[in-house]
Amino acid sequence: MENLKKALLEQFDLVFSDETLLETAFTHTSYANEHRLLKISHNERLEFLGDAVLQLIISEYLYTKYPKRPEGDLSKLRSMIVREESLAGFARDCQFDQFIKLGRGEEKSGGRNRDTILGDLFEAFLGALLLDKGVEAVKSFLYQVMIPKVEAGDFERVTDYKTKLQELLQINGDVEIAYQVVSETGPAHAKNFEVAVLINGRKSGQGQGRSKKLAEQEAAKNAFEKESSSCF
C-alpha cells in the first residue's frame, strides 16, 4: 500500500483520505476468497460505480468535443475508448498492474497481465476516487490519463475485425459468418463473454470480452489472422 500511495502522489498528486477504499479497489476477488476469515472486501462493487462515472465523463467529453458528429459515431468512439483492452492499457500506463492483490492461483495463471482483471481494476479505482474525492477529481484524473490519447486519435484507428473478416472471405464468394456465445460468466454488472465465430458452420476463431460485441471483435480478429495466413 505504501508504494501505491507514493506512486499516486508522485504521478497524479493524489492522496486518498479513506485508504480503505484504495485498498479495496486494488483487491481482486481471488485474493479476498483466499482470505475469507479476514473478511476482506474485493473491488467488484467499486468497479460497478467506476464504470458508471467513466461512461458519464467520456460521454460528456465526446458530446462537447465533437458537436457535429451523429450519435452513432459518438457511441462507436466511446465504446472503443472504454473497451476492456483500452482500460487495461490505461491501467498499465498508470502502473496499476504492479499493485493489485491477487490470489495465488490467479497470480500463477498470469492474472496480473490479464486485460479483464486490469480493466476491472481501472474502473474500481475510478469508483474509489469518486467516493473519496468526488466526480471532479475523477474527471481531472481521466483528463490526465485518457483524454490526451483520445485527442491524439488513438481510438479512431481501431480496427473493425468483423468487417475485415467479412471482406476477406467474400473474395472467394458468398460465405456464412455466424457468432455464437460459448459461455457467459461473472456477476450481472461485470459479465465476461466467450464467443466463437463460425464460417460456413466451421469454427474459425474464439474471443473473450466484457460485452458480446467486444468478444465478437476478439473472435473475428482471431479468425481473420488464421484465415489470412491460409489464404495467402
Curated annotation (Swiss-Prot):
Gene Ontology biological-process entries: mRNA processing; regulation of gene expression; rRNA processing; tRNA processing
InterPro entries per the record? dsRBD_dom, RNase_III, RNase_III_dom, RNase_III_sf
Could you name the active-site residues? 51, 123
Start and end of every DRBM domain? 160-229
Example GO CC term: the record gives: cytoplasm
Catalytic activity reported: Endonucleolytic cleavage to 5'-phosphomonoester
Catalytic class of the enzyme: hydrolase
Per UniProt, Mg(2+) binds at 47, 120, 123
Q: Which family does it belong to?
A: Belongs to the ribonuclease III family.
PANTHER family linked to this entry: RIBONUCLEASE 3, RIBONUCLEASE III
* HAMAP family tied to this protein: RNase_III (MF_00104)
What does this gene product do?
Digests double-stranded RNA. Involved in the processing of primary rRNA transcript to yield the immediate precursors to the large and small rRNAs (23S and 16S). Processes some mRNAs, and tRNAs when they are encoded in the rRNA operon. Processes pre-crRNA and tracrRNA of type II CRISPR loci if present in the organism.
Q: Could you tell me what this protein is called?
A: Ribonuclease 3
Question: Which species is this record about?
Answer: Streptococcus sanguinis (strain SK36)
